[in-house]
Amino acid sequence: MKINPDIFREYDIRGIYPENFNKEAAYQIGRVFADYTKVKNVLIGRDMRLSSPEILKGLSQGLIEQGVDVFDAGLVPIDFVYSMVPKNNFNAGIMITASHNPKEYNGLKMILWQRKPWIEPISGKLIKNLIDKKIKPAKKKGKIKKINLWKKYLSHIFSFVDLKKIKPLKIVVDAGNGLAGKVIPLIAKKIPCRIIPLFFKLDGNFPNHSPNPFEKGAMDKLIKKVVKERADFGVFFDGDTDRIVLVDEKGEPLFGDLQLLLLAKKFLKEHPKSAIVYKVDQSRAVKEFIEKMGGKPIRTKVGYFYTAKAMRENKAILGGETSCHFAFKDNFYADSGFIAFLIFLEIISQSNKKLSELVKEFKIYSKIHIPAIKVKNKEKVIEFLKRKYKNGKIDQLDGLTVEYNNWWFNLRPSNTEPVIRLTIEAKTNKLLKEKLSELKKLIKNL
């Protein structure tokens, strides 16, 4: 079978099932993964997507034929695989998931552990370059075994907080029919909070809303429920739970910048002068407040792969993204929605303030992110704007960033679509609207 090359991405593998990612593709990828990594065992977890059992069969078969022992963890969140691989001395881990993509998709996220303080993500593009290699089956086949590591996993995530410091808050949790519906009830047994559940039944059809919090309308039901119940705050988890979005008591989503600063304030108080990783598309406030709090801000490209790399290189204690991924040094430099959730619980409990009051100090700029602007020629747009705004401070760490004293923008081309992503921020809402209109006109006229 010839595999569609478009499914191999920088950080993972994702495609529509069964057209371009299916049992046969998973089988081939399993064989290539085994041949390349030379691992002896792999921990595999999967999300609740309807195609995940079939993908598991193909993937496991490919690994076993190459002599790899497969340990099937069952339906688990992605941070379960990230943390339980090193915690239990597995050589590697694979999560069957398409994260926040629509129900038609499925995919794989792959990691290695080489007895270091971190896990190593395996690029989908690396697998792509090896997919046509002829591989001889191993003389001795591997075995498959089911394994239950839930007790160890829960012990690990609870180790990030002092449960005695968590107060009886009222929280609306939107699991979106994803894995949070399985994990939050287990967490709830250990905390004094009242959890109001939304869409906890696991369902790969995602019948209630998109698993992507940035999709229009995805958070509407959560926002309404938080206000109606007069809850302390609300929480949205995406499908595989590696992203978490908080909603304050007024029904306003906080997203990545404000959430990262909440975490940074706590971490820098406990670990002064530590490095914290942030992204090129995050608010200028992130850098400024990390410095103000005595930390060392490390700016890097968008994407989990780059977060993990920058954290390792700078021994950062924390990393975050606009997309609401939060990675922790003590979680093997990997992200976890549930560790973030527990830490937010402790922060809010100990503050004796409403969530909206906690983040008020960080709201010093106006910002807009436009995830997709269709263009004919991405490179032409970037080169034109680079010339147009040549009197600003320019850098091209990730796309094009141009900074002025009272406003800035970042433009990043998509790797797979004819679109560009625009982030723009200004000191005032009026200036933001002016500059956004200016940029849109320039891009449209090209």
Q: Where are each of the predicted segments found?
A:
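An N-terminal, well-structured beta->alpha segment
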Residues: 1-67, 146-170
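Glycine-rich phosphate-binding loop
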Residues: 91-99, 103-105, 226-248, 253, ...
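Phosphate-binding and adjacent anionic-ligand microenvironments
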Residues: 269-446
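Gly/Ser/Thr-enriched, mixed-charge loops and adjacent short helices
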Residues: 106-229
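N-terminal small/polar loop signature for handling phosphorylated ligands or for N-terminal nucleophile
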Residues: 42-106, 187-247
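Short glycine-rich phosphate-binding loop at a beta-alpha junction
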Residues: 41-47, 71, 170-172, 274-280, ...
